[in-house]
Every structure is written in C-alpha cells, then in structure tokens.
C-alpha cells in the first residue's frame, strides 16, 4: 500500500453526464488518477444537506459496472452519500492501463500472473481502492467516522479487502457472497470487527 499512498491525489467531481441532479439529491461523476496514471471513474451521489453525512463505498460484481444512479438514489433518501467505483476493464468507464495481452473483458484473476506480483490486476485494483479511500478523506460534507463498504461477489471480496486495508476509515461492512477475497496482506485489526 505504500506505493498507492505515494501517488499524488488528482480528482474531479462534476455534475453527472448521465442524469441531472434533483432538488433533494446530487448525482456526480468522480474521476481520479490511480496507479500508473489510470483514469478511474466512480458514481457519486449525495443528498443535499449541510451537515456531514455517512458514506457507502460500493463495489460491483464480476464482470460488470456500477449500478445506475436511479438504482442507487435510495441511499440519498436514507441520508447517505454513495461512491460506486467501476473496476477497470470490466464494462464501466474506468480505464485499464495494465498493458496485458489478450482480453480485458474477463480473465482478470490471472491478468499479470506471468509478471511481477505487484503488477497483477487485483493488486493494482486494491491499490486504486486505497487511493479512493485517501480521496474520501478530502471530500467536503462526508462524516469520515461513518464510512461503510458494500458489495457482492467480486464486490464483496473488494469490500472485505477495503475494510482490512483501511481500518482507520472503514467503520462497517455489508458483504454478500464474496469471491476473490483470499489475498494475503499484513494488516492490523479492523476497528469495526467487534460490532459484527
């Protein structure tokens, strides 16, 4: 994670191109720079309110992309912000700069297997999620003591890794049928573990 922590934070938050915002909710496009200069995308929605709000980081299943803003609007109705990142090369907007030969539509679990371990697809993806977590700390209006992760399938595995690798940020996790979660890491205790 030290390599990801050394990447300078560059991000933009703009009005979503897909849908207009509502009186009660903002729909935003969040673009940020990840490992190796990758351009990464996440849907960002939040209720229009002045006090700091909790945030859900949501990760999608494999292969796929983040759900539509309309499907996610209920989070704003509950008073929560949501950031749903598109995993690179899996049907969303995030850019895959891995330089791997062959398809980037499937086969991500083995992408980079014949090279250096730190260049494997999922190593880079976990590092990009770490960069996203650093970025979250800078966003206005987010209560960083109430940041949660949510995901199913691949997204469940990413959510577990996100919680384990960012224990000072992630308070709780709602995980469904995780896959790709068995990556070894040296991490400390997760502060939300005793509440599960």
Model regions and ranges:
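Gly/Ala-rich beta-loop-alpha elbow adjacent to hydrolase catalytic centers
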Residues: 151-159
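Hydrolase active-site cap/lid region
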Residues: 158-196
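Short beta-strand element of the alpha/beta-hydrolase
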Residues: 42, 46, 52-62, 82
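Alpha/beta-hydrolase-fold catalytic nucleophile elbow
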Residues: 86, 150-152, 176-177
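Gly/Ser-rich "nucleophile elbow"/oxyanion-hole loop immediately N-terminal to the catalytic nucleophile
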Residues: 108-148, 152
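N-terminal cap/lid segment of alpha/beta-hydrolase-fold proteins
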Residues: 10-50
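Cap/lid segment of the alpha/beta-hydrolase catalytic domain
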Residues: 67, 73-74, 81-127
